[in-house]
């Protein structure tokens, strides 16, 4: 969790922040949008991309690259085709319209993901030291603004929906899926970065899970201050929304901004210029309570600290036990596998079968749905490397980015499998010519109330921690996604997806995948 390059501790801000030299920092993070993508693949995946990018530019960083890690069920199943088309199109449409290149990722198939696919999105951005913005609320009397899209009823109970198993009637939760607008997000990005340059911002927070109630509590708890919010001032796109709906709506492309008192006009002018709704809905107050009013009537009053991690929110110590299948795997003897002869007649069908397998064949169809050239910074368009290299125009260096996890390895041995995921990401970074710096992770597991699933979770974290210490790549933050299972097919394979950041100081040291000339030696 700590390292020489770390500019923010894990979980301290909306995303990890790592020093890349020359007065610049990289903000990067990976998150999941699994449950929404399972029932509405297009919007579920699209809003996952939007959410992770807002986490980056909320800190004052301009996103320059996106990656994703996708897992689906049986490749030949019609539902897999439907899910895959929708998810890939959602990622592509949102990312392409938003104007950020998708530079890498992975696609994996296994029967266990048939009902519950995994959709993990990663984003990285660049910001100058001293120009970052904290997700904090402080200074009694300072105004609180809601900016971005108007609030609707989409996404209400979205956080609760993501915290339960997918049942046979999961389609009934469709209203819990948010609806995205990448063009609005592009405007919000430019307006936000312009506003930060005015110096009028005290703190800023993306509105994600649980909407207003979550963003106000997180900012207030961090600043040890309260807020008084007038919910009737929230711009809406549906008439007669009730107070609890306004509090819990997860409508996309929205931010909460706390500004310095007396500089309200600067905030309003910037967002008016970009034609983005902006409304003062409250102010910072003394004490540590959140007060929510609807037409002057107090409808909720709660200590902000009671709702956040590290405060009054409960921390559970769960029982866990090793699954029976672990001993079955340990008893397996590889020597029992019949080794084929080295004859061409016997080897060729095996090679053809392997090269045609969905997990080994080309994923070009997926990659071609994403724009990887926009921004003119992706260095792997014509000369790919094991990691994705993205040119940092401000200092002439390059970021190296990779997302990795072999779910089957983690299923067979969570400790070793998670360590292998970190090692694979580090190898990809090194093989591109860069030095590994730091990690973000997305931990996708089943129901934590299942002792065997929780055992997988504990062991995977231990293995990941061991590997990160060995490679000196601190974990900057990330996301834990539980309940990835159906009520009738059981949990998915444990999938701790590793997003790793590296730095290439000298572009002439870039390493690419292609053979260079005849006569060069090949080593294994």
Where do the PLM segments sit?
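Glycine/proline-enriched, intrinsically flexible loops and inter-domain linkers
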Residues: 1-524
């Amino acid at each position: 969790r700590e390292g020489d390059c770390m500019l923010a501790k894990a979980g301290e801000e909306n995303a990890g922040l790592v020093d890349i030299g020359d007065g610049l920092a990289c903000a990067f993070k990976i998150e999941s949008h699994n449950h929404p993508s399972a029932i509405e693949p297009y919007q579920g995946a699209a809003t996952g991309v939007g959410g992770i990018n807002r986490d980056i530019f909320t800190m004052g960083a301009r996103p320059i690259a996106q990656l994703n890690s996708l897992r689906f069920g049986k490749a030949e199943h019609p539902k897999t085709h439907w899910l895959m088309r929708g998810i890939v199109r959602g990622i592509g449409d949102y990312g392409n319209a938003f104007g950020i290149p998708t530079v890498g990722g992975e696609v994996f198939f296994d029967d266990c993901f048939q009902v519950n696919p995994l959709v993990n999105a990663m984003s990285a951005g660049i910001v100058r030291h001293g120009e970052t913005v904290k997700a904090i609320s402080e200074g009694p009397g300072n105004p609180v603004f809601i900016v971005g899209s108007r609030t609707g009823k989409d996404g209400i109970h979205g956080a609760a929906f993501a915290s339960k198993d997918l049942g046979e009637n999961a389609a009934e939760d469709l209203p819990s899926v948010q609806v995205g607008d990448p063009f609005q997000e592009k405007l919000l990005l430019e307006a936000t970065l312009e506003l930060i340059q005015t110096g009028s911002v005290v703190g800023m927070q993306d509105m994600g899970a649980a909407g207003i109630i979550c963003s106000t509590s997180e900012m207030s708890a961090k600043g040890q201050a309260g807020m008084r919010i007038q919910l009737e001032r929230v711009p809406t796109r549906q008439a007669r929304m009730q107070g609890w709906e306004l509090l819990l709506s997860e409508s996309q492309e929205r931010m909460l901004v706390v500004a310095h008192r007396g500089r309200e006009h600067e905030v309003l002018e910037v967002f008016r210029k970009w034609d983005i709704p902006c409304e003062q809905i409250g102010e910072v107050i003394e004490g540590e309570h959140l007060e929510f009013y609807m037409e002057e009537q107090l409808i909720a009053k709660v200590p902000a600290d009671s709702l956040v991690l590290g405060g009054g929110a409960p921390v559970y110590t769960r029982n866990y036990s090793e699954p029976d299948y672990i001993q079955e795997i340990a008893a397996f003897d590889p020597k029992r596998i019949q080794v084929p002869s080295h004859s061409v007649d016997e080897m060729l069908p095996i090679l053809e079968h392997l090269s045609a397998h969905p997990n080994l064949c080309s994923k070009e169809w997926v990659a071609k749905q994403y724009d990887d050239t926009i921004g003119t910074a992706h260095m792997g368009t014509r000369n790919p490397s094991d990691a994705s290299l993205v040119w940092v125009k401000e200092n002439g260096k390059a970021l190296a980015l990779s997302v990795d996890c072999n779910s089957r390895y983690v299923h067979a041995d969570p400790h070793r499998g998670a360590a292998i995921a970190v090692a694979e990401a580090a190898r990809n970074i090194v093989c591109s010519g860069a030095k590994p710096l730091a990690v973000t992770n997305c931990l996708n597991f089943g129901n934590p109330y299942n002792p065997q699933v929780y055992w997988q979770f504990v062991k995977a974290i231990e293995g990941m921690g061991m590997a990160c210490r060995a490679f000196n790549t601190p974990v900057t933050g990330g996301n834990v996604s539980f309940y990835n299972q159906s009520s009738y097919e059981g949990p998915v394979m444990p999938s701790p997806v590793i997003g790793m950041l590296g730095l290439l100081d000298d572009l002439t040291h870039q390493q690419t995948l292609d053979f260079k000339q005849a006569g060069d030696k090949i080593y294994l």
